[in-house]
């Protein structure tokens, strides 16, 4: 199936979708893939971009996904699905090479290729479709979606309206730029980029005399390593600065990984809001640390460059905050730094900066601004999210709105983790069908979190009295 689709006539409220998805990243792609196996469930998913591409600026050669290949779009909910990573390999006659490679973790570029394969063959995905507005239609008791179909240049080609009984928002994250560096990032021609755009600027960075990488997570480590490997010994000209007190490894012990299970997600969701807000920043090594292999590769490369005497022209400094930033008269960049433990301050001159400063959840309430009066919020004005990943709404709105990767404050560190994608998709779909279509295990971890263990309402992972059951007669998408 091609991702380029001709416009179809807008349907009326007499033919609503059971579920309309806004955004097609890995999480909504997972949901679409699992929904494809459910008879009589009418779904369609919409994405403004012309095609699927997963973090294209960070598909560095050799960079690996930090979860096993079993954490694909569907396997942990339905390993017999045609959309598994193993079936992707089979379709490309690569099963035996993969088997002999004995790889549990695949490269990012391969994960991206797998997802693009699914996006090209899975029906009901509408790329080049911009959702303009979402409203609740009180007369029809349906969500009303206005959309614009875009041509290859991004210009409007067709406008339409559709209706759905339920929505799922998968609008993803956006690069985070620390406030002191925003003026430089927003100035054209200034060599300050976010790591999300690294590959686009890689050749220019390799030709630059001195580069500073800011940020200590996996992306920062991969960018630093790639620059280090491709710059001449003795003339590396690299600084790596991080606010964390150390270049710390990611927590990857077997029991530590149980923080990325449905058991922990349920436990976390049941905690008081104030406790949840304290926990997430304390758990930074669960999701902001560096893979052991990457740290080893960096140290090995640095050590290799000492074999002929001397030290590489690199500086790695943790515990540093960028207070302010600007440009010098010589058109270089000047960062004003402060060391957290010493209390000392210094001026750092460089020619280019790569910000590996992470991502922030996009505000989900902007895309559904017309529904803002109906959204129930917590003490910090964030949308409240229930156990089944639904925004808590005023009862006047009868249809549910689900969210993907926008609920770390409600479901913990596992919210953006690819390993929970299939499980969360199954939970959402089970709540949409009369009977659970993907039975889920009531227990998923050896760790018992809390003195009063939390258990799902049933083995299917939903509470029957909260289920939103929809029926329809066919699976044809009606939007787009």
Segments (PLM) and residue ranges:
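Conserved N-terminal ligand/cofactor-binding loop architecture of enzyme catalytic domains
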Residues: 55, 59-88
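Flavin (primarily FAD) cofactor-binding/catalytic cores of flavoenzymes
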Residues: 2-50, 54-56, 98-218, 222-480
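A conserved beta-strand/loop capping segment in the N-terminal third of enzymes
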Residues: 75-108
């Amino acid at each position: 199936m091609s991702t380029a689709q001709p416009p179809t006539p807008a349907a009326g409220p007499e033919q609503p979708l059971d579920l309309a998805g806004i955004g097609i990243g890995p999480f909504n792609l997972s949901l679409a893939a699992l929904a494809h196996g459910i008879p009589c469930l009418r779904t369609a998913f919409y994405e403004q971009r012309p095609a699927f591409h997963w973090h294209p600026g960070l598909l560095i050669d050799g960079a690996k996904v930090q979860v096993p290949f079993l954490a694909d779009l569907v396997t942990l909910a339905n390993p017999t699905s045609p959309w598994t990573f193993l079936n992707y390999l089979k379709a490309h006659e690569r099963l035996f090479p993969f088997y002999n490679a004995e790889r549990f973790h695949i490269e990012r570029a391969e994960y991206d290729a797998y997802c693009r394969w699914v996006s090209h063959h899975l029906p009901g995905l509408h790329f080049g479709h911009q959702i303009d507005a979402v409203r609740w239609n009180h007369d029809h008791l349906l969500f009303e979606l206005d959309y614009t179909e875009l041509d290859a240049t991004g210009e409007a080609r067709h406008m339409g309206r559709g209706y759905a009984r339920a929505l799922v928002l998968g609008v993803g994250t956006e690069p985070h730029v620390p406030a002191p560096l925003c003026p430089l990032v927003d100035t054209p021609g200034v060599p300050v980029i976010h790591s999300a755009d690294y590959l686009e600027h890689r050749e220019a960075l390799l030709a630059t005399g001195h580069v500073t990488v800011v940020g200590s997570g996996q992306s920062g480590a991969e960018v630093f390593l790639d620059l280090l490997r491709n710059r001449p010994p003795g003339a590396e000209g690299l600084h790596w600065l991080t606010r964390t007190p150390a270049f710390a490894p990611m927590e990857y012990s077997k029991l530590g990984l149980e923080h990325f299970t449905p058991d922990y997600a349920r436990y976390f969701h049941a905690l008081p809001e104030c406790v949840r807000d304290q926990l997430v920043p304390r758990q930074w090594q669960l999701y902001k640390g560096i893979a052991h292999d990457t740290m080893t590769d960096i140290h090995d490369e640095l050590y290799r460059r000492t074999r002929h005497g001397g030290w590489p022209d690199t500086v790695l400094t943790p515990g540093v905050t960028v207070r302010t930033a600007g440009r010098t008269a010589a058109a270089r960049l000047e960062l004003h730094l402060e060391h957290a433990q010493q209390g000392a301050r210094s001026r750092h001159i460089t020619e280019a900066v790569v910000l590996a400063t992470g991502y922030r959840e996009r505000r989900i309430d902007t895309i559904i601004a017309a529904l803002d009066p109906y959204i129930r919020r917590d003490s910090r004005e964030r949308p409240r999210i229930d156990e089944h990943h639904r925004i808590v709404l005023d009862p006047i709105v009868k249809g549910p709105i689900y969210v993907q990767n926008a609920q770390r404050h409600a479901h913990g560190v596992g919210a953006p983790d690819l390993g929970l994608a299939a499980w969360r998709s199954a939970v959402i779909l089970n709540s949409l069908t009369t009977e659970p279509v993907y039975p889920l295990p009531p227990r998923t971890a050896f760790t018992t979190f809390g003195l009063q263990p939390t258990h799902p309402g049933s083995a299917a992972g939903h509470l029957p009295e909260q289920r939103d059951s929809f029926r329809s007669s066919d699976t044809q998408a009606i939007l787009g």
